[in-house]
C-alpha cells in the first residue's frame, strides 16, 4: 500500500511530487525547507532554517503515523558548508539520541536563493530487527 501526503506548498503540484510517501513500513520525506505558506522565512539564519525544515519533516512523518525516532536516514543540502556548526546543532537537537545515518552536502543553490538548507528523510516503522 502506498500513501501520499502534501504540505500544500505551491510547487508540489507544479513539479509533480508529494511531501512524503509511505510505501509499506518505509516513509520517504521529500526535501523540506524553511517556508511558511510558500514564503521563505528566517532568511540568513542557517540554524533557524534548519530547525524549521526539520519541523517540516516531523510534520510530514506525523501525518503518516510516524515520529522522529522512526527516522533512519537524513540528507541535508546546504548552500554554504561553513555554516555546518549551526546546521548540525539544529539537527542534533532533533536527532541527537536517535542518531540516524546522515549526510550533509554543499550544493550550488536551492529552489529559492534565500534558502540555505533543505532536509530530506527516510523513516522505518517496521519491526526493530534482531535483538
Where are the model-predicted features located?
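Short, polar/acidic, helix-capping and beta-turn segments at strand->helix junctions
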Residues: 1-131
Amino acid at each position: 500500500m502506498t500513501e501520499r501526503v502534501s504540505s500544500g506548498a505551491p510547487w508540489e503540484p507544479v513539479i509533480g511530487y508529494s511531501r512524503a510517501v509511505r510505501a509499506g513500513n518505509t516513509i520517504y520525506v521529500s526535501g523540506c525547507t524553511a517556508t511558511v505558506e510558500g514564503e521563505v522565512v528566517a532568511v540568513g539564519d542557517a540554524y533557524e532554517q534548519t530547525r524549521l525544515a526539520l519541523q517540516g519533516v516531523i510534520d510530514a512523518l506525523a501525518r503518516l503515523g510516524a515520529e522522529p525516532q522512526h527516522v533512519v536516514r537524513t540528507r541535508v543540502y546546504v548552500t554554504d558548508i561553513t555554516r555546518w556548526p549551526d546546521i548540525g546543532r539544529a539537527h542534533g537537537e532533533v536527532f541527537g539520541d536517535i542518531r540516524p545515518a546522515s549526510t550533509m552536502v554543499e550544493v550550488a543553490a536551492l529552489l529559492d536563493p534565500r534558502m540555505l538548507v533543505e532536509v530530506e528523510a527516510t523513516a522505518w516503522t517496521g519491526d526493530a530487527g534482531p535483538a
